[in-house]
């Protein structure tokens, strides 16, 4: 499954997390832990927000990864699907709602 994480960092947490982030190597930043693959991550540094898309079969593994960042920021996590998966789900919804 794919998951979309949206984060927001409070102003008082911004510099501490920024210092943590810039001290990490690219390999450390790319490591989401066993069973979690980072598809992409985008930052809005002016607004102190961003998004990440990860893929994993185990929500617990995703929760562990997100949990390491929770002391610094609020994170909303939602399961997401790609176009083909959404089309298949949409076909099923339409079929289920035929009268």
Regions found by a protein language model. Give the residues of each.
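Conserved short beta-strand edge segments in small beta-sheet-based binding/regulatory domains
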Residues: 72-83
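Mid-chain, well-packed structural core segment of small domains
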Residues: 54-67
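Short, intrinsically disordered, mixed-charge
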Residues: 64-71, 95
């Amino acid at each position: 499954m794919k998951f979309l994480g949206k984060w927001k960092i409070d102003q008082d947490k911004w510099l501490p997390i920024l210092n943590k982030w810039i001290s990490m190597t690219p390999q450390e930043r790319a490591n989401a832990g066993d069973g979690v693959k980072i598809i992409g991550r985008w930052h809005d540094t002016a607004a102190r927000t961003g998004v990440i898309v990860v893929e994993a079969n185990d929500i617990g593994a995703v929760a562990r990864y997100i949990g390491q960042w929770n002391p610094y920021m609020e994170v909303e996590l939602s399961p997401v699907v790609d176009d083909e998966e959404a089309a298949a789900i949409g076909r099923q919804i339409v079929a289920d709602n035929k009268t």
